[in-house]
Amino acid sequence: MKIKVTFQERIIEHNFETEITNLQQVTQKLCSLFLITNYYSYSLFLSSGQLVDNINLIDEGSEIIIKHLNRLGTISIGSGYSNSVVGTTNNNAPSSPSSSININGQQIQQQIQQQIQQQQQQQQQQQQQVQLSPDTLINNLLNNLKDNTFKKKAFFDLKDLKEEILIKKFVEKNGIEVIVCQLKELTGNTLSYALSALQTIMSYEFTITSMTSTDTASLITQLLPLTENTSNPSISKTSLSLLCLFLNQSNNLNFKQFSSTLVLEYNEKTKRNYNHTLVQLLSSSNTVDVQLNALTLINIIIGKTMSTTIPGLENGSVTGGENGFNKLLKELDEYEINQKLKKLVESIIVAPELKRQLYIYQRHRFQVITNRKNVTFNKESSEHDALLMKLWSLTYPGVKLESRVSEQWKQMGFQGTDPCTDFRAMGIWGLDNLIYFAQNYNEKFRKIVNSQIDRKEREYPTATAGIVLTFELYNSIFKMGTPNLNPYNSTTSNTTSNTTSTTNIDDLPFFPLFFSHPHAFEEVYCTTFQILDSTWDDMNGTYMHFQKIMSSVKNLIITALESKPTTLEAFDWKCQKNTKNSNGGTNSNQNNSSSNLLLSNFANGSSLLSLLNDLSSSSRDDMKKLLTGVNYQVLDLIKSQKISYFQEGFQFKLHKQLKTKQSLPLNWIFIRLFNNNNNNNNNNENCSYEIQYCFLSTELNQPPLPNQSIPTNYNTIKISDLFFNGESTNSNNKKKDKSLSYFNISIKDEQIQSLIQNQLPLSNLNNSSNSLQLDSSTSMNSIKDSIINISSSNNNIKDNLTNNNTNTNTNNTNNNTSNGNGNSNSVSMSSININNSGQLSPNTTSPILIPQQQQQQPQSSSLSVQHQQSSTPTPSSPVLLSSPSLQSSSSSSSSSSNPNLFTIDLISSNRDDVSNFWDSIKLLSGQEIKSQEGLDDYHSLLSINTSVKLLDLDGIDIPKETPQIPILPDNFDFRTV
């Protein structure tokens, strides 16, 4: 809720992100905006003068005035707010200042006493309401809900209703239907109170079961779009919470209805899937409660989908059961949910409940593996047989398998001639992991298999070892088979089991690593397999040592996961470090971690670029991969920031002004980036950007107009049509102000080219009959019906603007100039009129802007429009100038090498604007950053991110909270201590 607050002569706009329920807290908050500590000595008033004694008086857009109680008596009667605040005075009262003060002071005291009495009366009424029968109390509430005057107060009271008997009476009297029917009409705090009231009512299980299918469908249909309410996070949060309550307490039939409503209504209206909307809420919202409720709803939908069989629906609805479960998770992967959750995991502070929901989602992902593990290998299945043949062809390409049951399988490391007997423990999942390793790391997998021949009597069965690794990862390391930690093993319909809701989240096996890759388990499996093979040689293992070596590898993986790595790179780094430590520190020169090298070189003042070049030229693939990832993240962050600046727009001054045919100087250019998709999507890759610009006419020494006052009429060009040629290095201009930045750009725009090619000479412009002449006896009102003429030489300009959808209608006539007595013949050929207020009225959408003129007498006998504008001290809001001829003060503005480019020299006093503008164009064009400021930012961010990454990989914990500042010593004279 957004309100305007005034204290003395200061005005501040404040936005309440959460619902307000306590007047004292609101007063304290608003007083703190003006650094008022003794807020209890102040009161809030509306702009009408009414004292704010009820929180319901504050609504969206309210204007609040803060007044000191002791100073209200000094306000004279009849001024400002005294009539409303103090009341009407006696006409016979003395008029002296002292008596006026006393009268007002007494009235203030009386009004305060009246407020106390009103509060006491309200308390008595509440006590009386408690004594009323439930029927009477609920009837009063329902009547107030239907009355616009008391509706907001009724919702506010209803959300605090806690007695179960009253809730039952409210439901029996169709109270839910009364609320649902009004949701579409409610806004602001009233809507927030209504949703909170629904949340209170639906927290009782009997309310869900008592709802009809019509009420259920109507409620869900209205709640779904409310979850996207970004202007009021409280509405979005409560709507998501209501959907969670509904699904948690519903039976399977209602969930089918929910899914049907979700697919058939919301998706058709919005042309997108609601699951995608929920995933976007995980990243687009800055409110933790919204992110938490969105993830909770996702978990509930996943759990309900697994336990419910939903008939197939049209338009791509999700079916229930295991197939629907797998399909839903695959769909969430397509919406990049893992990237969103990874950012939540990497947050500075993760709330315990949010961490719990992250764990529950992780268990859902584990369930996919469990389902696959429970599939027994069937030798009669053609699908399973095809998977087995795929493993053979990946391991021995070009080698023909003699038969389905063959001794050749023992070469791969199976125990017998029929591999299906080895998959009993882990089902088809054991085969899936072997295929993943052989397919994605074929060379390494084949090397491990073929190396068993060289080991002779020291070999180990490769395929069998891989199946054992799958078993250990599933049961001992990731604990996927632990029943009491599985969210599905709950007697209730809630997807969060009783165990997970009571167990400390820090005691649960939570692995942030799984949010970094869609196949995180398989990637960990491949890494572990390679560690097993290298450890086998390091320990000179034999088949008799298999269990001992496997136990050592398992402990190594568990130790690496204890540090909670968030990426696979960090996990690999931890494993390598633990492997070297377990081997006794051999090859010490190679064991120095790159992070220690980098940090020590930083301490010695070495160059970042040289260090990064050394690391990137290293033969270690993990370092190259790490640096590539950090570099991509830094560039993506810089690009997002630069694009954000460009979307707000830049205003630059023209080094040499352009002039219109009417001699109006154009001194400024406003240019911005525009997202043509209009979908508020922060993903730059999915945006279709264009560049918009317009010229402004203000005083030469005046600053440009503020961004918010610029109209939305722009010329639009492609990104490829704008060129930043670089900063000016003209040595001839020795008087350049060093505090200013000089640069030039080139614009490829047919409309601008047409305007420039049809320009009139500047020398003929002032004496041309096309200028509207004014003398000392002419006022703006006397020429309000006059129209600026456009000469016949500009027909092609008009045609060009018409082709660009400006819809300019001009009929060229001859204009007779004024003879000095103020009499001029009006001409009806223009798209700019002078209205009754003496202001220019736009009828077109040209990118040329001039400020409105103020009514004032000209100082000379013959003044052009340009002269009158120059006498205006401060430019007011701009209006549009139609179909002007542009005149550059330098003929070199057009590039001689490319006649289609129009080059403009610009000046800026803000160096940051120039660098942000420059870098934005380069990054959007797929080029490298060129400005020195941009390069400095890039190097700084790259340095910080690389250092943090390496510190994390090296096991150095970085505190997430700012350390406390030590207490100052009592004695600073340390020599006497």
From Swiss-Prot:
Function: Functions as a negative regulator of actin polymerization. Modulates actin/myosin II at cortex actinomyosins to prevent excessive F-actin polymerization around the cell periphery, thereby maintaining proper cell shape during phagocytosis and chemotaxis.
Origin superkingdom: Eukaryota
GO molecular function: myosin II binding
Subunit structure: Associates with mhcA.
Biased composition regions of type Low complexity, renumbered to the chain: 792-838, 852-897
Lineage: Eukaryota, Amoebozoa, Evosea, Eumycetozoa, Dictyostelia
Species: Dictyostelium discoideum (Social amoeba)
Free-text disruption phenotype from the record: Null mutants show the remarkable ability to engulf multiple particles simultaneously, also positively respond to a cAMP gradient but form spurious peudopods which are normally suppressed to promote efficient movement up a chemical gradient.
Domain ELMO: 383-561
Annotated segments matching region Disordered: 792-899
Coiled coil: none
Gene Ontology cellular component terms for the protein in this record: cytoplasm; plasma membrane
GO annotation, biological process: actin filament organization; cell motility; negative regulation of actin filament polymerization; regulation of phagocytosis; sorocarp development
Protein name: ELMO domain-containing protein A
Cross-referenced InterPro entries: ARM-like, ARM-type_fold, ELMO_dom, ELMO_domain-containing, FH3_FHOD1-3-like
